[in-house]
Amino acid sequence: MMPFDIRVGQGYDVHALVPGRKLILGGVEIPHDRGLLGHSDADALLHAVTDALFGAAALGDIGRHFPDTDAQFAGADSRVLLREAARRVREAGYEIGNVDATVIAQAPKLAPHIGAMVANLAEDLGIARGRCNVKAKTNEKLGFEGRQEGIVAQAAVLLWRASVGDAQD
């Protein structure tokens, strides 16, 4: 038995850019002529982090907990979903160590908004800002991201808990 149960989770999300929607990433509304299409607010960054949390705790994925077939999640604020995911992960006995995420978008430039995204992640997860990181990358005009047809987000999280027995409980 290890003295600590340490878990790593990986999350991924992608949404199409379409006219007539707000662009929300990391809980921040970003000025742009298009937004992300989805059942909720389509915040790809928070969805990737949420998926990484559930994965690390072996609790399934975002679709299992917040299905896009459930009307109660139509237009949902992804910050609310992230806070609930963090609550469920803690309920399972885990603490959140850190989060590292990457958003891949050709446009708009995301660098001016990274600080606000990190602040939202830290607040929603109940951890220090220094334990949250968000990076923005372009796809060098390659693929659907480069053609500005959509935005991708990837996230990794570290969870831990002091082991008192089998991690399969």
Curated annotation (Swiss-Prot):
Catalytically driven reaction(s): 4-CDP-2-C-methyl-D-erythritol 2-phosphate = 2-C-methyl-D-erythritol 2,4-cyclic diphosphate + CMP
Keywords: Isoprene biosynthesis, Lyase, Metal-binding
Group of enzyme by EC: lyase
Pathway: Isoprenoid biosynthesis; isopentenyl diphosphate biosynthesis via DXP pathway; isopentenyl diphosphate from 1-deoxy-D-xylulose 5-phosphate: step 4/6
Binding site for a divalent metal cation: D13, H15, H47
PROSITE patterns in alphabetical order: ISPF
Cofactor binding annotation: Binds 1 divalent metal cation per subunit.
Binding residues annotated for 4-CDP-2-C-methyl-D-erythritol 2-phosphate, in chain numbering: 13-15, 39-40, 61-63, 66-70, 144, 147
GO molecular function annotations of the record: 2-C-methyl-D-erythritol 2,4-cyclodiphosphate synthase activity; metal ion binding
EC number: 4.6.1.12
Residue(s) at site: Transition state stabilizer: H39, T138
Cofactor names: a divalent metal cation
CDD domains hit by this protein: MECDP_synthase (cd00554)
GO biological process: isopentenyl diphosphate biosynthetic process, methylerythritol 4-phosphate pathway; terpenoid biosynthetic process
Pfam families (alphabetical): YgbB
Classification via InterPro entries: MECDP_synthase, MECDP_synthase_CS, MECDP_synthase_sf
Family assignment from sequence similarity: Belongs to the IspF family.
Quaternary context: Homotrimer.
Its job: Involved in the biosynthesis of isopentenyl diphosphate (IPP) and dimethylallyl diphosphate (DMAPP), two major building blocks of isoprenoid compounds. Catalyzes the conversion of 4-diphosphocytidyl-2-C-methyl-D-erythritol 2-phosphate (CDP-ME2P) to 2-C-methyl-D-erythritol 2,4-cyclodiphosphate (ME-CPP) with a corresponding release of cytidine 5-monophosphate (CMP).
Protein known as: 2-C-methyl-D-erythritol 2,4-cyclodiphosphate synthase
